[in-house]
Structure formats: C-alpha cells, structure tokens
C-alpha cells in the first residue's frame, strides 16, 4: 500500500496529503537543526544519569512515608545536574504545572511581600493562585501583593515599566517562558537571561522564578543556566517524555528548593517524605526520552505553522521564526474553525479517536475552553493535543506528539476537518 493510500485509510484525502508533502519538502534544513539540538540535550541527560550512577535499585517502589527513597533522591540529583542547579524537587505528589508553580510561589513569598510579573498577565490558572481573580487560599488572601509590567505592543520587555515596578517589597519575579493562551511570542533563554540580569542589577536580592512549562529541551540552554533561582514545570509535559503519568519539578537554589519541599509536605519534613509509588521507571525513562520526544513535537509545530500560514492564517511563531517552546498558536478567526481543527486532532488520536470535542466550562478559566487530547495520560500536552479558550481572536494552541509522524498526521487531520467544513479551500 502506498503512503497516500495509508493516509486515506486514516481519513486524510489525497489533496490534503499532497498539500502537506509540498510544504514538508521545504522544511528539511529546519528539521536537521532540531535534530542537532535533540542530540545535544540527549547527551546532557545521559551525562547526568551516568554521573549519578543510575541503576536498577533506583526503580524500586516505595510506599507510606517514603523514608530513605534512594530512587527518588537520586532522580532529584539527576534533575539538578540536567538543569545545572544546586537542588531539585521532583515528585508525583506535585499534581500539575499550576500546582508546582503554586508551591514555588507560596514557599518563597511571605505576607507583605510583592510578586512582580514583568512579562504581562500570567497564565489563566495562575490568576486565582495570585488573587487577580478572587479565590480562597490565594496569595492575595495571605497578604502577598501583585504587580505587573505589561509587554510593549511588539511583544518585547518594557524595561522602563519594569524598573518603575520594582520596589523594596518586590521579593520574587515570575517569568512565564511560554505564551500560554496569548498570541505574544514565547521568550528565548537568551531573552530571559537578559531580563534576569536587568532585574537583579536593580535589586540584587530579588528571586526569579521561571515557568518553564513547554520549554524544556527546546534549546540547548535552560533559564537556570541564565541565573534563574527556580525553574518550574510539569512531568506530563516535556521532561516526562510522555511516560510520566503525573508529577512536577522545581529546580533551583538549595534555599528555594528547601522551602518548596517544606511547603509541599510540612515544615520539618521537607524532602525526607514522599513515596514514589512505583513511578521511578517512568520518571527516569521519560526524562531519558524527553529530548527526542520534544524534537518530534517541535517538528510538528514548525509543520503546522508552515501549513496554516500558507493558507492565510496568522501563526505565532510564524513559519520561519525560531522556536522557544513546543506550542504553535494558529488564529482561526471563528468558533466553528476552532471546533473543526480540534475535531481533526481528536480524530488522529490513538485513544478516544471516536470522541467529538466540544467547548466546556473548564475549572480555572474564565471562558469556555475546547480541548482535543486523545492521550494515554489525561491532560498530557507532550502528547498530540490542541486547545484554546473560545474567545477573540479564536486562536487554537497546538502542541505535542510523542512521535513526529503522529504530529504530522494530527496536523493533516485538522486541515482535513477545516476543508470538510468549507472553511478552507485548497
């Protein structure tokens, strides 16, 4: 059976397949560069595992308190070496990226302190954590204030506004690397490094936390290489490699990570407790595979931008820009187009491919959200997925794909559904 016939069997018409192949022919140099980054990061992860003498004993399950859990403790040493930090907290008890960020913020901010975002509004779910939208147990309720310096219209840092916002109460600065549900560019590690240096020149004792979600292993360097006191993320995104079924990480200075451990468990207990529940093989192997998995997701994002920009849709990043996370935003312009796109992603899934995604009132968001994710791990965004809030400018956010070939199929299926809906003509 020819390749185009196999795609037709999966629901992709010959016209859509041929359009995709035409676009793909021009992307070989981009894909080669992505592979080189993956090779570098694979070596970095392997070196950390070899340095810490990972062996079969580290895969043993623990229960209860988890005292003397050498597999867990060694994994945290591996993460600290991968991210070039003094310490790391890597736990299945951290349920998601928002949870990891909440632990990091609440552990390192006290009543009377101020949190500053120099990159505009935070991701939707953090609005309630901070207290921008009212919620019980928010930082605001505990007496932590919040300040924000918006980006310039071109998406660059407003250094004058940032300088004016930093004051004697500014204790912690939070930088969101990825665009989230916005259409601004994601920030490169170099850009984040320049911002960190600027902030610390004004207030040397200020702590900087980087929300690293969706950005791990996209570049050769991480924000922790550029002076961040903490980098924070989710194991069901990039660093879990699609194998971790739950978890989050915080890598940073010994002081910051120690405080995070006390906040996650209890004062006096810290990192000494927290059973691994048999998840160590998935955590170690997922980290090992992560550079390769991320490279496939990046190829999918580049392919999507080139597919949709050619059809007249605005894409962030655009078809030729460099990549700093795995997310591809495509502004589709209507609710109907968003739904059609997500139906295509869902139809390409290995799990729940027969399900039709519809917008719904998702907890933590102030508008209906549509999500397509036929994933092995619920909510995993390193697996092929697409989502977005049903609001202007009706942008859908595509990410993931455990393999490049699956990402490719998902993008072609999204286009197929737009063609079938009469929204796109090839």
For the regions a language model picked out, list residue spans one by one:
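Generic structural marker for isolated residues within well-ordered, non-membrane alpha-helices
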Residues: 76
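Conserved PLP-enzyme active-site core in the AAT-like
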Residues: 3-28, 35, 45-58, 66-69, ...
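Acidic, PIN/NYN-like endoribonuclease modules and their adjacent C-terminal/linker elements
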Residues: 38-42
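Conserved C-terminal alpha-helix-loop-beta "cap" of PLP-dependent enzymes
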Residues: 309-426
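Short glycine-rich or small-residue beta-strand-to-loop segments that form or flank ligand, phosphate
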Residues: 58, 62-63, 89-92, 326-331
